[in-house]
């Protein structure tokens, strides 16, 4: 599997990097950590080309270099990568420019597969979308944003599962809230949820929510299948059938001490644009991490 962790700053991206690497370890996934900076001007791009053989002299995006330096130090400190015994510093001259707006360095992983550090410049949605397509990414991990449209566009336009790291504290005692129904992505979400629960030793609440007064048979069958799968996987769990508004029930159940896992909406892109989707609304409303599985 391949994970992409998007980081923006040393001050705000620690929870994203922390949780992202822990989940990647659970999946034994290859990981790319990407910083997306502002678009470089045509003049700056030509300067980058002249300096591509020695990126120590590249001052075009010093913030990006500093953020990758911080990520590198985190990886070394937590033993996610094998550091250079002669020099534990982040060596920028190892960065290789692959495009006008992209450079990278690949490191040998210890608890995951290969770890890549990537710097891109340009529109964040387009850059992350291109990186996901380029690397065949399975899960993109991002921090929560106050810009509602940004999360909406990431969920709609990026062709991978999306893990939104919101209000995460590594010392908090979490449970896992798993949304179960008869939608196409539910079985994949259940399998992802099991991997996360195993890695973090989480109790799982597999919840099926109906906004009508009756549970249709397909919902009941999905709940039974989830119960069987969790039991066979050896996961400590409970299965619940609940009547009520989906967003409200998820919010009241999750609070701030759950990690939510749910399948992506099957609505058309046009319908999502005008009306939104349940996963998007849950990720906005609930004050906890949420994994939306595609």
Segments the model singles out, each with a brief description of its role:
Residues 58-62, 69, 87:
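Functional cleft and adjacent loop/helix regions within the main domain
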Residues 73-140, 231-270, 288:
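Structural beta-alpha unit
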Residues 34-36, 120-122, 165, 207-209, ...:
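Conserved beta-strand termini and adjacent loop/short-helix elements that scaffold enzyme active sites
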Residues 11-13, 17-19, 117-170, 254-294:
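Gly/Ser-rich helix-loop-strand patches that form or flank binding pockets
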Residues 20, 71, 128, 193, ...:
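Aromatic/hydrophobic pocket-lining residues that form π-stacking "cages" and hydrophobic walls in ligand
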């Amino acid at each position: 599997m391949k994970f992409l962790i998007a980081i923006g700053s040393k001050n705000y991206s620690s929870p994203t990097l922390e949780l992202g690497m822990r989940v990647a370890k659970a999946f034994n996934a290859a990981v790319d950590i990407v910083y997306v900076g502002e678009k470089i001007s045509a003049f700056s791009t030509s300067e980058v080309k002249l300096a591509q053989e020695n990126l120590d002299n590249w001052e075009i995006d010093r913030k990006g270099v500093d953020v990758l330096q911080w990520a590198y130090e985190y990886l070394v400190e937590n033993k996610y990568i094998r550091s250079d015994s002669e020099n534990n510093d982040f060596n920028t001259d190892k960065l290789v420019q692959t495009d006008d707006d992209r450079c990278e360095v690949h490191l040998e992983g210890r608890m995951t597969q290969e770890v890549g550090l990537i710097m891109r410049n340009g529109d964040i949605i387009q850059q992350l979308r291109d990186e996901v397509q380029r690397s065949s990414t399975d899960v993109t991990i991002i921090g929560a944003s106050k810009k509602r449209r940004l999360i909406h566009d990431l969920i709609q336009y990026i062709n991978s599962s999306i893990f939104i790291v919101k209000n995460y504290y590594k010392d908090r005692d979490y449970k896992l809230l798993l949304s179960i129904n008869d939608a196409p992505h539910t079985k994949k979400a259940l399998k992802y949820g099991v991997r996360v629960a195993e890695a973090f030793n989480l109790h799982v609440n597999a919840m099926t929510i109906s906004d009508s007064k009756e549970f249709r048979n397909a919902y009941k069958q999905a709940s039974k299948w989830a119960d069987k799968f969790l039991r066979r996987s050896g996961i400590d769990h409970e299965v619940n059938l609940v009547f009520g508004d989906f967003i409200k029930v998820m919010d009241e159940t999750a609070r701030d001490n759950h990690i939510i896992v749910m399948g992506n909406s099957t609505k058309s892109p046009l319908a999502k644009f005008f009306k939104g989707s349940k996963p998007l609304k849950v990720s906005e409303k609930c004050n906890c991490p949420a994994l939306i599985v595609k």
